[in-house]
Amino acid sequence: MLPCASCLPGSLLLWALLLLLLGSASPQDSEEPDSYTECTDGYEWDPDSQHCRDVNECLTIPEACKGEMKCINHYGGYLCLPRSAAVINDLHGEGPPPPVPPAQHPNPCPPGYEPDDQDSCVDVDECAQALHDCRPSQDCHNLPGSYQCTCPDGYRKIGPECVDIDECRYRYCQHRCVNLPGSFRCQCEPGFQLGPNNRSCVDVNECDMGAPCEQRCFNSYGTFLCRCHQGYELHRDGFSCSDIDECSYSSYLCQYRCINEPGRFSCHCPQGYQLLATRLCQDIDECESGAHQCSEAQTCVNFHGGYRCVDTNRCVEPYIQVSENRCLCPASNPLCREQPSSIVHRYMTITSERSVPADVFQIQATSVYPGAYNAFQIRAGNSQGDFYIRQINNVSAMLVLARPVTGPREYVLDLEMVTMNSLMSYRASSVLRLTVFVGAYTF
């Protein structure tokens, strides 16, 4: 039983109170340590290991990450990452970092710095030590006493995330643009290639780069054209050339014969003709050029496509030769009374299929007698009626081709001029013996 406080003297009262306090103290209070331990944020004291250990906020904080984000614990904190993000732990096999010692001594340096061995404050590289809160899509840049989260080139920050910039919206490319994550690529249409700035397109000269043209190549903007030499035409494939058969287009290209050749054609003439102005055929006058084989006793007569050697003296009894082409029947010869007084030899040539009627030869009287009348007729050589005589006047007449004739062919026509004088009872005749050569062609 404790003594009554009012009955005790003052000194005894103080001792009694002291004993009462000491006697009521708990045995546990006497076992408390005389110091305490404090850990930094994200860590808690582990009494067993006597060190600070990491707090797994993903387990201790309800709904630490919202929405479709997943919680990733790390030393001293946690991260909220997309569920598709991959996390590589212990990349170098070094194991977890050593336990953080108790923060018994405060950091004497300003935020973002830490003391070194010489007690100097050095910058903390938050990026290298993973002490930043930059998103996986961001780049961490260390700064003196701090750090900065930036977006890579080709990205821009929208909210907390870096989003790809669609550069194609800004028409950086001249032709086509392909957007890429963080970048873009320009492409050109066929026939163009990227210029030095990788944005503009310049024309490709396909002709200098081995375009598949068989003959001629013409470069144009963005493409090329194949062309062929004269005498060729472009094939359906647009590259190769095929010969044009000009001879098959028309039968009038050449006067005689058309010969097709690669890329061209040529005209040929028959024997006895020569080419004139590349397409026409002209008769070769062998008599004038000396390209004949007539003897001195013969006369060379040219006709279309050839020549004929005739005897210089063509007079037959009772006629005698009085000049190169004229034969005379003497009046003193009784055999000449019923014959033409003279025969003159002439030669001419015409082409085949000549248009009719056609004037081919004119007969002219060489002598005119007063009161005489001249009549002209075909005496011989016109059995088929291919010719007829049209008298022009008293002294001349025209030999007319009545029907088209085809050569090679030869006519010998005796064209007779009969001279009559009724007052003097005079009648005489003379013959022009005309040899008509019909050429084998229409030229």
Curated annotation (Swiss-Prot):
Residues the record marks as carrying a glycan: 198, 394
Mutagenesis / variant outcome for changing residue 279 to C? In ARCL1B; loss of secretion
Q: Specify the superkingdom.
A: Eukaryota
Q: Which SMART domains match?
A: EGF, EGF_CA
Q: Where is this site: Cleavage?
A: 87-88, 90-93
Q: Which GO terms describe its biological process?
A: aorta development; aorta smooth muscle tissue morphogenesis; elastic fiber assembly; negative regulation of vascular associated smooth muscle cell proliferation; positive regulation of aortic smooth muscle cell differentiation; positive regulation of collagen fibril organization; positive regulation of smooth muscle cell-matrix adhesion; regulation of collagen fibril organization
Q: Which residues form the signal peptide?
A: 1-23
Pfam families in the cross-refs: cEGF (PF12662), EGF_CA (PF07645), Fibulin_C (PF22914), hEGF (PF12661)
Q: Which GO terms describe its molecular function?
A: calcium ion binding; extracellular matrix structural constituent; heparin binding; protein homodimerization activity
Impact reported for residue 57 to K: In ARCL1B; does not affect secretion; decreased elastic fiber assembly; loss of interaction with collagen type IV trimer, FBN1, highly glycosylated form of LOX and LTBP1; Does not affect interaction with LOX when LOX is non-glycosylated; proteolyzed by PLG
Q: Which UniProt keywords apply?
A: Basement membrane, Calcium, Disease variant, Disulfide bond, EGF-like domain, Extracellular matrix, Glycoprotein, Repeat, Secreted, Signal
* Keyword Glycoprotein listed: yes
| Described function | Plays a crucial role in elastic fiber formation in tissue, and in the formation of ultrastructural connections between elastic laminae and smooth muscle cells in the aorta, therefore participates in terminal differentiation and maturation of smooth muscle cell (SMC) and in the mechanical properties and wall integrity maintenance of the aorta. In addition, is involved in the control of collagen fibril assembly in tissue throught proteolytic activation of LOX leading to cross- linking of collagen and elastin.
| Subunit description | Homodimer; disulfide-linked. Multimer; allows heparin binding. Monomer. Interacts with FBN1 (via N-terminal domain); this interaction inhibits EFEMP2 binding to LOX and ELN. Interacts with LOX (via propeptide); this interaction is strong and facilitates formation of ternary complexes with ELN during elastic fiber assembly; this interaction limits interaction of EFEMP2 with FBLN5. Interacts with PITX2. Interacts with ELN with moderate affinity; this interaction regulates ELN self-assembly maturation stage. Interacts with FBLN5 with moderate affinity.
Disease named in the record: Cutis laxa, autosomal recessive, 1B: A connective tissue disorder characterized by loose, hyperextensible skin with decreased resilience and elasticity leading to a premature aged appearance. Face, hands, feet, joints, and torso may be differentially affected. The clinical spectrum of autosomal recessive cutis laxa is highly heterogeneous with respect to organ involvement and severity. ARCL1B features include emphysema, lethal pulmonary artery occlusion, aortic aneurysm, cardiopulmonary insufficiency, birth fractures, arachnodactyly, and fragility of blood vessels.
Protein name as annotated: EGF-containing fibulin-like extracellular matrix protein 2
Species of origin reads: Homo sapiens
Q: What lineage, starting at the top, does this entry show? A: Eukaryota, Metazoa, Chordata, Craniata, Vertebrata
This protein's gene is called EFEMP2
